[in-house]
Amino acid sequence: MTGLNTAGHDRDYDTAGLNRELQDKGFLLTTTEDLINWARTGSLHWMTFGLACCAVEMMHTSMPRYDVERFGVAPRASPRQSDVMIVAGTLTNKMAPALRKVYDQMPEPRYVISMGSCANGGGYYHYSYSVVRGCDRIVPVDIYVPGCPPTAEALLYGILQLQRRIRRTGTITR
C-alpha cells in the first residue's frame, strides 16, 4: 500500500486551498498553536548548568563569533526566567539533587539539552562510583549533543534541532 497516509489526517491539507485564496488578499491562515510555537522557538531563554570542560564550549557558543541571539536564544541567570537548561559536563551524585531542584524551578514548558559524553552517559568517568551515568536519569532530556567536548557548532546545531522539534511537535509531551 504505497501512497497511503498512515500517520493520520493532515490538517494543513484542509487549509491549503483556503490559504491560497486568502493570500492574494493579504491574509494569513494559521492556528493559535502554530503561532505560539513559532513565538516560543524565537524566544528560548537558556540557563547554564556547566559542570566541567563542556561548559567552556557552551560559553564559547554565546560569544559574538556564533551569536546565538540571532536565532532567538538568549542566556538567563535564573531558572525561573529560562525555558532551556543546558547540562554540560560530569554530573556527580552529590550534584544530582541540585540539578533536579533547578529543573523543578523552571516554568513549563521546559526543555533540557544534554551536552557532551559525560552528561549523556557518564563519559570517561562512567564507571566511577560518584558519577551519574547520564543526566537523563535525573531530568528528562530533549536533545543530546555528542562529543568530548562537543564543539560550539555542535551545541548550536542542538539548539536549532530543539527549535525545529518544538515547531514540528508543539509542546513536547513527556
Curated annotation (Swiss-Prot):
Localization in the cell: Cell inner membrane
Coiled-coil spans in chain: none
Any one Pfam family match given in the protein's UniProt record, by short name: Oxidored_q6
GO BP of this protein: aerobic respiration; electron transport coupled proton transport
Binding residue positions for [4Fe-4S] cluster: 53-54, 118, 148
Required co-factors: [4Fe-4S] cluster
GO cellular component labels: plasma membrane; respiratory chain complex I
Known EC number: 7.1.1.-
Keywords (A to Z) from UniProt: 4Fe-4S, Cell inner membrane, Cell membrane, Iron, Iron-sulfur, Membrane, Metal-binding, NAD, Quinone, Translocase, Transport, Ubiquinone
PANTHER family assigned: NADH DEHYDROGENASE, NADH DEHYDROGENASE [UBIQUINONE] IRON-SULFUR PROTEIN 7, MITOCHONDRIAL
Protein purpose: NDH-1 shuttles electrons from NADH, via FMN and iron-sulfur (Fe-S) centers, to quinones in the respiratory chain. Couples the redox reaction to proton translocation (for every two electrons transferred, four hydrogen ions are translocated across the cytoplasmic membrane), and thus conserves the redox energy in a proton gradient.
HAMAP family assigned: NDH1_NuoB
Identification of the protein by name: NADH-quinone oxidoreductase subunit B 2
Organism, scientific name: Cereibacter sphaeroides (strain ATCC 17025 / ATH 2.4.3)
Organism classification: Bacteria, Pseudomonadati, Pseudomonadota, Alphaproteobacteria, Rhodobacterales
Gene symbol of the encoding locus: nuoB2
